[in-house]
Amino acid sequence: MNGMNHSVVSEFVFMGLTNSREIQLLLFVFSLLFYFASMMGNLVIVFTVTMDAHLHSPMYFLLANLSIIDMAFCSITAPKMICDIFKKHKAISFRGCITQIFFSHALGGTEMVLLIAMAFDRYMAICKPLHYLTIMSPRMCLYFLATSSIIGLIHSLVQLVFVVDLPFCGPNIFDSFYCDLPRLLRLACTNTQELEFMVTVNSGLISVGSFVLLVISYIFILFTVWKHSSGGLAKALSTLSAHVTVVILFFGPLMFFYTWPSPTSHLDKYLAIFDAFITPFLNPVIYTFRNKDMKVAMRRLCSRLAHFTKIL
């Protein structure tokens, strides 16, 4: 393709979620509140883990990085959606659209691998506690973090390298509030069936494969605990429950999107809202309300801050 082809379309237009003024107002309030709550909740986790020495362990290091990814992920689409809700002309440049897609897939892929790392951390803590600190060393934690970032970048670049040179000569309308790869491919002025199949296989395989791997690891952990100590099964279930809930919230919409034969545009929008606002909001709620150490650390940090303000 020559470079002049895709320069015909300089921007893409979003249709948004609704044209009703009343529903737009509700969406604006809902989106703003959940985005603010998501950012604050995840910031609290990062701040608590950083400031409290009792939480300087592999588990909480990975959790803090998961919170950072969640903040970045919900910031890809949420701010623009909030700003565009009342606009009649909701547009994004070609470069802006590609950037949005790139970071969505890069951060999504990174989070998938990080969740696998967190499952491995729980396996070592529950099934091999004597070797936990030896294997889950600071170097290993950094290795997990670097590996997840590299895999996320590769996953995103592999798909976008074929997209940037596609010809886009119109139409330029997205029946959505954000840029996603399948819709972008359908707007290209050429046959993209093979590319669409490659994208679906790429994203579908990494989503379903990661989820299956996580489920197998959780089953293996529970089986190992049950085999050695029936009394420890309840404790293992309690420990894993937060991780399993987060995994289901993250992978559920993704797998539904990539395995459902023909999802409607309305369904796509609802799943996107869930990913952009609900999941990043629920993750810190799950990890704080279901984790005694985190709650104790937060209370301890609040006491220190209150004492510090009194001194001032």
Curated annotation (Swiss-Prot):
Pfam families: 7tm_4. Odorant receptor. The chain crosses the membrane at residues 26-49, 58-79, 101-120, 140-158, 196-219, 236-258, 270-289. Belongs to the G-protein coupled receptor 1 family. SUPFAM superfamilies: Family A G protein-coupled receptor-like (SSF81321). Residues 50-57, 121-139, 220-235, 290-312 are cytoplasmic. It is a multi-pass membrane protein. Disulfide bonds join C97-C189. This is Olfactory receptor 4F15. The keyword rRNA processing does not apply. GO terms for cellular component: plasma membrane. Residues 1-25, 80-100, 159-195, 259-269 are extracellular. The keyword Protein transport does not apply.
